[in-house]
Amino acid sequence: MGQGKFAARNLVRTAKKFRWSDSVYSRRALKLKLKADPLEGAPIGRAIVLEKVGVEAKQPNSAIRKCVRVQLIKNGRQVTAFAVGDGAINFIDEHDEVTICGIGGRAGRSMGDIPGVRFVVSGVNGVSLNELVIGRAEKARR
């Protein structure tokens, strides 16, 4: 391949062609992250609790992480969200409306030892889950 004085057009064309083999570029150019994202690019979303589930932690840890299976209101997609805090799962009941946001793993993926869980419950029926766990607020009855 030419590196000479008049090779610029050729170099640019080749660079553009081989750029597609870079996974980061191709995902960004085709907007794959946005298409796959259940929240559709939004930072938080509202959802209805379908059931409580216990997710086993990955090795070398041994625990059952308390999560909830929820259905998003905006598009009907089902995702699993982690309930953070000691006894937090007790404040969440089926058919409650919860607010979920990303768990903060790299590239929008899961975090730590909880496999396949990419979201966190931040609120229940309009009240912060953290406030409920601390005891500073009471859950609103619907």
UniProtKB/Swiss-Prot annotation:
A molecular function GO annotation: rRNA binding
SUPFAM superfamilies referenced in this protein's UniProt entry, alphabetically: Nucleic acid-binding proteins
GO CC aspect terms: small ribosomal subunit
Biological process annotations from GO: translation
Keyword terms, alphabetized: Ribonucleoprotein, Ribosomal protein, RNA-binding, rRNA-binding
Family label: Belongs to the universal ribosomal protein uS12 family.
Oligomeric and partner information: Part of the 30S ribosomal subunit.
Protein role: With S4 and S5 plays an important role in translational accuracy. Located at the interface of the 30S and 50S subunits.
HAMAP family membership: Ribosomal_uS12_A (MF_00403_A)
PANTHER family, alphabetized: 30S RIBOSOMAL PROTEIN S12 FAMILY MEMBER (PTHR11652)
Protein name stated in the entry: Small ribosomal subunit protein uS12
Organism annotation: Methanocorpusculum labreanum (strain ATCC 43576 / DSM 4855 / Z)
Taxonomic placement: Archaea, Methanobacteriati, Methanobacteriota, Stenosarchaea group, Methanomicrobia
